């Protein structure tokens, strides 16, 4: 387990960490999620020992490491832009940490073979970093970080420099890797989908503080406040409530918007709106709407099937209703 208690870090007048306390369970993958400047990378670097806290305590596996040098914290660290040894093969890059620790040659060979198989690079061991794709280089970086069998694996936006398709593939791969090695892992990301996809738990950060910690289902379905709800995905304000676009039903008359729900349009909170634009997004369709009463813009997300049945056109009048309204705590 990693425990950070009352962590503070200031850069001049800017509070990068403002009294942060968090427990990261052993064997889990925890994502630190937040916008730029929220403090997530500073928290990760403080756990690694790369940033000295102004105040607070960092404990790893029951040991206070607050003043312990990074190389003595038993961690593996992977950055967004990984600096591989260009003159070394993939095998030698992965083996580097083991050789520095003067492990027996047979042990090094066995461990490197095992890791190359786990990360899917066993056929690339004699290649050099320049001969690998970006995704392959990051898999090599993870193998190298895991080679010394660290207690903790720290990942600072490891897939941030890669294109969307490669990132999506590596997210799936990282989740499978974690289920195989079960090392306590902390992942920094600003990508909501990435956090929801791979993490056991998510800590949402904002302005140097932790807004909420919970499972992906907790933070998405039961957000602690409006910031968490807004940051975890698109939202629309409908009749004074924040709702998800895919939780809005659209129809050409109030009864269609109500569907199977009982009650009048007024009691059910049906909103009259004008279609501004219909945007096809592959398997879903975004309907951009303008509230007829307030003039505010909001969006509804509908399936392709519903969109084809409705055949909405710009400028026509429709009715919208929230099918689910998250219960936000009173602020």
Curated annotation (Swiss-Prot):
Function summary: Part of the ABC transporter complex CysAWTP involved in sulfate/thiosulfate import. Responsible for energy coupling to the transport system.
Question: Primary place of residence?
Answer: membrane
Annotated membrane topology is: Peripheral membrane protein
Q: Name one GO cellular component term.
A: ATP-binding cassette (ABC) transporter complex
**Cellular localisation:** Cell membrane
Subunit note: The complex is composed of two ATP-binding proteins (CysA), two transmembrane proteins (CysT and CysW) and a solute-binding protein (CysP).
The record, for CDD domains, names: ABC_CysA_sulfate_importer (cd03296)
Which source organism does the UniProt entry give? Nocardia farcinica (strain IFM 10152)
Enzyme Commission number: 7.3.2.3
Please give the name of this protein. Sulfate/thiosulfate import ATP-binding protein CysA
Q: Enzyme class, one word?
A: translocase
Disulfide bridges in this chain: none
InterPro entries cross-referenced by the UniProt entry: AAA+_ATPase, ABC_SmlMolc_Importer, ABC_transporter-like_ATP-bd, ABC_transporter-like_CS, Mo/tungstate-bd_C_term_dom, P-loop_NTPase, Sulph_transpt1, TOBE-like
PROSITE patterns to which the protein is assigned, alphabetical = ABC_TRANSPORTER_1 (PS00211), ABC_TRANSPORTER_2 (PS50893), CYSA (PS51237)
Annotated family: Belongs to the ABC transporter superfamily. Sulfate/tungstate importer (TC 3.A.1.6) family.
Q: Which GO terms describe its molecular function?
A: ABC-type sulfate transporter activity; ABC-type thiosulfate transporter activity; ATP binding; ATP hydrolysis activity
């Amino acid at each position: 387990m990693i425990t950070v208690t009352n962590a503070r870090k200031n850069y001049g007048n800017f509070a990068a960490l403002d009294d942060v306390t968090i427990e990261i369970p052993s064997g889990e993958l925890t994502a630190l999620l937040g916008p730029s400047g929220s403090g997530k990378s500073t928290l990760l670097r403080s756990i690694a020992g790369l940033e000295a806290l102004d105040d607070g305590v960092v404990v790893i596996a029951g040991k206070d490491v607050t003043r312990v040098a990074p190389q003595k914290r038993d961690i593996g660290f992977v950055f967004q832009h990984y600096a591989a040894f260009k003159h070394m093969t993939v095998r030698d890059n992965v083996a580097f940490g083991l050789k520095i620790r003067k492990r027996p040659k047979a042990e090094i060979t066995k461990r490197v073979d095992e890791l190359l198989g786990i990360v899917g690079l066993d056929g690339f061991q004699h290649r050099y970093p320049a001969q690998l794709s970006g995704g392959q280089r990051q898999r090599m970086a993870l193998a190298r970080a895991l080679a010394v069998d660290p207690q903790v694996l720290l990942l600072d936006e490891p897939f941030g420099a890669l294109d969307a398709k490669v990132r999506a593939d590596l997210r799936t791969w990282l989740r499978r890797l974690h289920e195989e090695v079960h090392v306590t892992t902390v992942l920094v990301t600003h990508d909501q989908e990435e956090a929801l996809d791979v993490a056991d738990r998510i800590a949402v950060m904002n302005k140097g503080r932790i807004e909420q910690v919970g499972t992906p289902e907790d933070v998405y379905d039961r957000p602690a406040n409006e910031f968490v709800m807004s940051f975890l995905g698109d939202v629309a304000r409908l009749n004074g409530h924040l709702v998800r676009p895919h939780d809005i039903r659209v129809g050409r008359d109030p009864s269609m918007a109500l569907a199977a729900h009982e009650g009048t349009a007024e009691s059910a909170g049906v909103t009259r709106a004008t279609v501004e634009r219909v945007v096809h997004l592959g398997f879903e369709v975004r309907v951009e709407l303008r509230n007829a009463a307030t003039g505010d813009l909001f969006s509804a997300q509908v399936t392709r099937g519903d969109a084809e049945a409705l055949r909405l056109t710009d400028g026509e009048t429709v009715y919208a209703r929230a099918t689910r309204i998250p219960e936000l705590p009173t602020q």
